[in-house]
Structures are given as structure tokens and as C-alpha cells.
Amino acid sequence: MTDNNPTRCGYVAIVGRPNVGKSTLLNHILGQKLAITSRKPQTTRHNMLGIKTEGDVQAIYVDTPGMHKANDKALNRYMNRNASAALKDVDVVIFVVDRTKWTDEDQLVLERVQYVTGPLIIAVNKTDRMEEKAELIPHLQWLQEQLPNAEVMPISAQQGHNLDALEAQIAKHLPENDHFFPEDQITDRSSRFLAAELVREKIMRQLGAELPYQITVEIEEFKQQGHVLHIHALILVERDGQKKIIIGDKGERIKRIGSEARKDMEVLFDSKVMLNLWVKVKGGWSDDERALRSLGYGDL
């Protein structure tokens, strides 16, 4: 700490509807892949911390599941509760919206963030895709009218446009505090959790429209032996048909899933990785609160 630059540290919640670019934003800010992404809604299921320390400032980002209307299964209720809980006890809230459309789920998030009493920034994403920037002005003005106390900033999470300005604005709002985490720590999540998420990401990207949402991944073994990290991952589905989809014809799809996940793991863990995948049917797990707790989904 210097006289001109007090040490600042605080929590920053990133909220918004599903598939609006929250995890992409976090990854770009951190400068590395931490949160999984795909084009499918509800990719993020858990709140996860992404920690960025730069000089005197430590910003602790809370990446959240997309707030959505579906509340019929225990898993949906868990994700919505996690996202709403992130609005409490944070120092700054980033409400991510897509400049191309406004949905009922955006409105749902707006109705929740309007009660935020601390600093609120509306990050209008995907503005790099606009040919005429003047077309954006009415949308920015409308957002400002909806949340008069918020700061509205156009960004591109994918391209990194205006993220330096966003981070500077966040830093201004963080309280003067000693840093809560070591300078080199980037998340609160375990390596096993990150490995499971990478496998789930590759499943979501491989399956596309065939994707059964009732999929989760459990790491059964995570062991470093010499220069090789051995990881055994169990993919849980709810029906036999889902198992067949993931395995694919002659096992080709699950081989691709494993190959792509392994490559990302080797970068993340800086080690050669031996990855083994299995698929198991566990009927009804996504609506079974006891099963969800045993799979690490916390309080329901």
C-alpha cells in the first residue's frame, strides 16, 4: 500500500440470465479459462470465485448460474437460489445483458437487482457486433431509465472491448481492505471440481441439440503419479438413451469428449493427464435433493 493507492479488496457478483456471457466475461478478466462456457443455457450451475489481484487491488468475482424461470426440479431451484444469494454481501454487482435482445428472464433479473443498495453496473455485452454504434444509444438510455442508480457500460466479453474501463470502475467501488487471498490464487474451487467442469463443458459442446440437461460429472480419482495426473471421471445421466447419446457410435463421441477435456486439463494443471471416463445411469438425480447434496450441490 502507498499513500496514493490504498489496498482495496472486495466481492463482485456477476449476474444475468442464462447464456448472456457471464462466464466468458470472467475468463477474459482473469486472462485464463476458469469458468466453463457453451452456447447452451444453464451451463454454469454453481457459484464460483474468480480472483484477480493487480497491484493494490484484489477483485473477487462471483460467477453465478443464470437466473431463469424454470423452477420445477431441485437442480433448477438450487441454481436460482445460488444466483440470488450472490446479490447479498457483495461490494459490487455486475448485471450482464445482451444488447441484441431483452427476454422475460432479463426482466426477472432486473426486478431482483433493482433492490441492490450498493454499486451496480450494467454491462451491455456483444456490442462489438454492431455496425452502427449509434443504434446502441436508445437501448443504453432505456436501461438507465430502468435502473437510474446504475452505471451503464457497453462491453464485449468475447473480444475484451472496454473491459479495462469496466475493471477500473469496479476497482473504484471496492472498499479499502487487506487482500483476502494470496496474490497467485485464482479461485476457491478445488482441482477436482475444475476437472469435472471441464468434462461437463465438452459434453455440452459435443452434444448440441441432443444435450440432455440431466448430466453431471463426479471425479472418482484424482492422483498425481510421477509426471502423470490420473483422473477418473464418472458421467451421470438419468436414462439409458442419454447414456447411448454420450457414448456415441462405437464410442466415438465419448472419445472426443475425453480428448478435448484432457487437452484443457493439461493446460490448467500444467501436467500430462491420463483421463478415463465412464457413463452411469442414475434415474431422477436432478430432482433428488439427497442425491444432489451427495454430488456437491450444497444446500437446497
From Swiss-Prot:
Q: Which residues form the KH type-2 domain?
A: 199-283
Q: Which InterPro entries match?
A: G_ERA_dom, GTP-bd, GTPase_Era-like, KH_dom-like_a/b, KH_dom_type_2, KH_sf_prok-type, P-loop_NTPase, Small_GTP-bd
Q: Where is this region: G5?
A: 155-157
Pfam families recorded for this chain?
Answer: KH_2, MMR_HSR1
Tell me the residue numbers annotated for binding GTP. 16-23, 63-67, 125-128
Q: Where is this protein found?
A: Cytoplasm; Cell inner membrane
For region G4, the annotated ranges are 125-128
| Annotated Gene Ontology cellular component terms | cytosol; plasma membrane
* Gene3D superfamilies, per database record: 3.30.300.20, P-loop containing nucleotide triphosphate hydrolases (3.40.50.300)
Chain segments carrying region G1: 16-23
Q: What is its main location?
A: cytoplasm
**GO MF, any single term:** GTP binding
**Gene Ontology terms describing biological process:** ribosomal small subunit assembly
Membrane topology per the entry is: Peripheral membrane protein
Where do the segments described as G2 lie? 42-46
User: What keywords were assigned to this record?
Assistant: Cell inner membrane, Cell membrane, Cytoplasm, GTP-binding, Membrane, Nucleotide-binding, Ribosome biogenesis, RNA-binding, rRNA-binding
Q: Where is this region: G3?
A: 63-66
Q: Indicate the family of this protein.
A: Belongs to the TRAFAC class TrmE-Era-EngA-EngB-Septin-like GTPase superfamily. Era GTPase family.
Q: How does it assemble?
A: Monomer.
Q: What is this protein called?
A: GTPase Era
What's the source species for this entry? Answer: Pseudomonas putida (strain GB-1)
